[in-house]
A protein has these predicted regions:
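Intrinsically disordered, low-complexity Ser/Thr/Pro/Gly-rich regulatory segments
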Residues: 1-34, 38-192
Length: 192
């Protein structure tokens, strides 16, 4: 789990009150994994969260530019590319991992039809990210529409998590650092 996935995992645990499972391998998925799966016991909501974060603003995508990433990560399409030998890439073979993704959901007890898909990115170009962004995504290869929630790590997840963590979390280095940063900001504001 990389740092941004760790932050998102902590957000779903501490802010949303979910149990989480990170880096779940897709069953027979040829090096595919689901970044974070989360489950909220009271509401019985099941989440599949994918994290695509870069903090350089010029690399941040618009909602339209995120579509191929949704199709690959949530719905198992293979990215369009050509192999050195014609017909050898998953794309050229027309391979889809959708059935393996749904099998993986079922393997952890999720109903594939009820999974809430969440994409986390640094920011979405051209959109205010201070609250969740809900979009309807049409998957061409599945011929249906799915709701996807997009969260800005910079504008939504980090502030929510910093408000929740306080100054404890001694066993989690990443959360401890976020706690230090929050306290620095609070104490610096008092001095100014």
């Amino acid at each position: 789990m990389n740092a941004s996935e760790h932050i998102v995992d902590a957000y779903f645990r501490l802010v949303r009150g979910c149990f989480t499972l990170a880096d779940k391998k897709v069953i027979k998925g040829n090096n595919r994994q689901l970044d974070v799966l989360a489950y909220h016991l009271k509401s019985r909501e099941a989440f599949h969260i994918e994290v695509g974060v870069t903090h350089q603003q010029n690399w941040c995508l618009s909602i339209e530019e995120l579509a191929p990433h949704f199709d690959k990560k949530f719905f198992g399409t293979s990215p369009e590319r050509k192999g050195a030998v014609d017909g050898m890439t998953d794309f050229e073979k027309g391979k889809s991992y959708w059935s393996k993704i749904t099998e993986t959901y079922e393997n952890v007890g999720f109903n594939p039809e009820e999974v809430i898909r969440v994409w986390v990115t640094w920011i979405v170009r051209g959109v205010d990210g201070r609250s969740p962004i809900n979009v309807e995504f049409y998957s061409n290869h599945l011929n249906r529409t799915f709701p996807i929630q997009i969260l800005s790590l910079r504008d939504y997840v980090l502030p929510q998590l910093q408000n929740e963590i306080g100054t404890a979390n001694y066993d989690d280095e990443l959360l401890r650092v976020l706690g230090f940063v929050k306290q620095r900001e609070l104490q610096s504001a008092m001095i100014s």
